[in-house]
UniProtKB/Swiss-Prot annotation:
The protein, known as: Secreted RxLR effector protein 122
Keyword Nucleotidyltransferase: no
Gene: RXLR122
Motif RxLR-dEER: where in chain: 48-65
Signal sequence annotation: 1-21
Organism: Plasmopara viticola (Downy mildew of grapevine)
Lineage: Eukaryota, Sar, Stramenopiles, Oomycota, Peronosporales
């Protein structure tokens, strides 16, 4: 850095010498020890002794030396900062050069993976992706909310899925816990929620539907338990709301459990809309491996023919349902049918 300082001074001195030679005056010896004094003297000179004046030859040299010294000092102050900036730029460039770069193959693989994910249809979610609804959630309703009329939702009748509802119901009963005891009507409602042939609903809307189902059951119990309601009318409003909420959450938790179980096994129960459509048309072959064909729609006490071959009914629990209350009664004893001839239901009869 000192070398650059002296080089700059030498250049300035040479320039001053040339200027003095052109004006006809000789440049005096420059001494660092007297720069401050010369500068102070130069500041007191009047305007008539500026450069170009020939009356006072000595003052011109002093003025030029003072200006030159000021320029040199300012340049010397700026040189370290410029050097630091140059070093900083070199460090940044070196750091950028050492930064690891992503390989082109990784970029191509990520891009191809994104394209494949984008091409997949949205309705290919597996059962593992089913989140379900928490069974710890409660529905606290105030008495004012209970006092208003609860309108029933538009629920499809079981006849909508009458071609396959029995087989889906049988499969659903097998995967449910014993205390749930779902009915055919409840199975049809759950099927309607998971039916992908229509616009899929969100989990929040499903939860609202389950809450509505539970409210309908509370109203049904209200009509059945008139004597108990007569006693409840004598109680205060908060107590009545508490009793209603207790019943509501009992029904709601049951619906949530059935909903989660149906959602976990929906591919086995109803499959895709294409499989359901095929099963409604009575196709055979690979579609028989699904749950829709795994449970044949054959009455337990029915007997019929099938090319003269006989078979024995397997042990199955038979459920009876009350059409008015839609509540399953306790299962009856297992029935063992004697050897008899079976008849395939319509749509599954073997060709001659």
């Amino acid at each position: 850095m000192r070398g650059a300082y002296y080089v700059l001074i030498a250049l300035l001195v040479v320039a001053s010498s040339q200027t003095s030679a052109e004006s006809g005056h000789q440049l005096q010896v420059y001494d660092h020890d007297f720069v401050a004094a010369d500068t102070a003297a130069a500041t007191t000179l009047p305007r008539q002794f500026l450069r170009g004046s020939r009356n006072v030859p000595g003052d011109l040299a002093h003025e030029e030396r003072a200006i030159t010294s000021e320029l040199v000092e300012e340049g010397a102050k700026l040189i370290p900062r410029a050097a630091e900036n140059v070093e900083e730029i070199s460090r940044v460039a070196e750091a950028v050069g050492k930064r690891p770069r992503v390989a082109e193959e990784d970029v191509l693989n990520k891009a191809s993976g994104a394209n494949e994910a984008f091409k997949k249809p949205r309705n290919t979610a597996t059962d593992d992706a089913f989140q379900g609804i928490s069974t710890e959630q409660l529905l606290p309703l105030s008495y004012k909310q209970w006092d208003t009329e609860i309108k029933s939702m538009r629920i499809p009748k079981p006849e909508k899925y009458q071609n396959n509802i029995q087989s889906v119901y049988d499969a659903f009963v097998d995967v449910c816990d014993e205390d749930l005891k779902p009915t055919i009507s409840e199975t049809a409602r759950l099927w309607n929620l998971f039916d992908r042939s229509f616009k899929p609903l969100t989990t929040r809307l499903h939860q609202q539907a389950l809450a509505q189902f539970a409210k309908e059951y509370v109203l049904r119990d209200e009509l059945r338990l008139k004597t108990e309601w007569a006693r409840m009318n004598e109680r205060t409003m908060p107590n009545r709301a508490g009793m209603l909420n207790m019943k509501l959450n009992w029904h709601f938790q049951r619906w949530v459990r059935m909903y989660n179980k149906f959602g976990e096994r929906r591919s086995e129960l109803i499959g895709t809309p294409l499989n359901v459509a095929r099963s409604r048309g009575g196709t055979t072959g690979a579609s028989r491996g699904t749950a829709l064909h795994r449970h044949s729609i054959v009455p337990l006490n029915a007997a019929s023919t099938s090319k003269g071959k006989s078979s024995v009914f397997t042990e199955r629990s038979q459920r009876t349902f009350d059409d008015n209350t839609d509540i399953a009664s306790p299962p009856s004893k297992h029935i063992k049918g004697q050897s008899s001839e079976l008849v395939e239901p319509e749509g599954h009869r073997s060709k001659p």
